[in-house]
């Protein structure tokens, strides 16, 4: 049949097919392709390689675990159910990458809840932060048959920071930036299961009864000081604000570190048998802890409490009065 004898609809269909084929050929032969490598600056590439839940993004390591279990879409649509399913996998699979992913994804979901306009979501955020701290502890200490990660593993360094932040946020009360860190004995119902919390009194020249409140040192930027005395390690650095007993007697501001130890594994957690121990250390008394025969340094910050105590302009005025007075006008505990 000649082209002139063909129906108009057939000729039109052929034109459409030819046009579509032309578009496809041009898309593949053009300047962009579906898969490619774009040259960029070293700084931009570093940001892409090192993105984690700590800066509000899902790392490549956590995304790999989600992809392996076909849970990427579910984490976007139903994060709680996704975290529950990943925990079930962690009970069957001792690989450390599952624990790392659970630590990061719980932290990421907790951070998203803190930005919610619903009061219930903000309160629930600390439960996911606590779960993140427990998973990070499992990952760092080696749960089950999984060995502790190599210190050169990038996930090891990120997990330490996740743990330190999540320990404080797991017991935070109030809304940011006015949260205080307050903990007590008892049970906490988390998505994987209930955990029992035990507390240990600090050993040093102050007790918990001497402290009015603890503040997260990580949420303070210091001004007017040349350096910040900070030691890297494990634990949440805190500012302990002492109680003011008399009007002219100022409570001390002391540096402390809160450490969480989890005695058990993911399976014990699912069974409701996980015990979490909270230990608070005075920075002036302890700078490390013992863990399975190893000495682990504590994360400490001695400058933040000092700078915080100088926030009060009254201290500056009284300091001037005290300098020119032969009598003791300022007393501390």
Q: Which residue ranges define each predicted feature?
A:
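C-terminal motif of bacterial Sec signal peptides marking the signal peptidase cleavage site
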Residues: 27-30
């Amino acid at each position: 049949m000649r082209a002139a004898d063909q129906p108009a609809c057939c000729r039109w269909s052929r034109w459409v097919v030819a046009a579509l084929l032309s578009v496809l050929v041009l898309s593949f032969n053009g300047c962009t392709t579906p898969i490619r490598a774009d040259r960029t600056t070293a700084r931009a590439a570093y940001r892409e390689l090192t993105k984690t839940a700590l800066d509000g993004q899902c790392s490549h390591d956590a995304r790999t675990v989600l992809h392996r279990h076909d849970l990427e879409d579910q984490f976007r649509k139903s994060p709680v159910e996704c975290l529950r399913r990943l925990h079930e996998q962690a009970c069957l699979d001792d690989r450390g990458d599952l624990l790392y992913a659970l630590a990061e994804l719980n932290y990421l979901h907790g951070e998203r809840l803190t930005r919610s306009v619903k009061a219930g979501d903000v309160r629930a955020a600390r439960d996911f932060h606590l779960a993140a701290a427990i998973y990070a502890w499992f990952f760092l200490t080696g749960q089950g048959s999984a060995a502790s990660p190599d210190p050169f593993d990038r996930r090891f360094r990120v997990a330490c920071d996740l743990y330190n932040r999540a320990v404080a946020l797991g017991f935070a009360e109030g809304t940011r930036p006015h949260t205080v860190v307050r903990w007590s004995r008892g049970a906490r119902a988390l998505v994987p299961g209930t955990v029992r919390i035990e507390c240990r009194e600090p050993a040093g020249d102050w007790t918990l009864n001497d402290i009015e409140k603890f503040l997260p040192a990580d949420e303070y930027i210091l001004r007017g000081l040349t350096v910040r005395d900070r030691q890297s390690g494990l634990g949440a650095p805190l500012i302990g604000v002492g109680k003011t007993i008399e009007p002219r007697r100022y409570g001390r501001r002391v540096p402390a570190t809160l450490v969480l130890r989890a005695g058990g594994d993911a399976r014990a957690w699912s069974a409701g048998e996980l015990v979490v121990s909270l230990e608070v250390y005075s920075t002036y008394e302890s700078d490390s802890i013992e863990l399975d025969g190893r000495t682990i340094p504590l994360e400490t910050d001695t400058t933040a409490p000092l700078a915080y105590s100088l926030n009060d302009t009254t201290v500056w005025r009284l300091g001037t009065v005290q300098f020119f007075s032969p009598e003791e006008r300022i007393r501390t505990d």
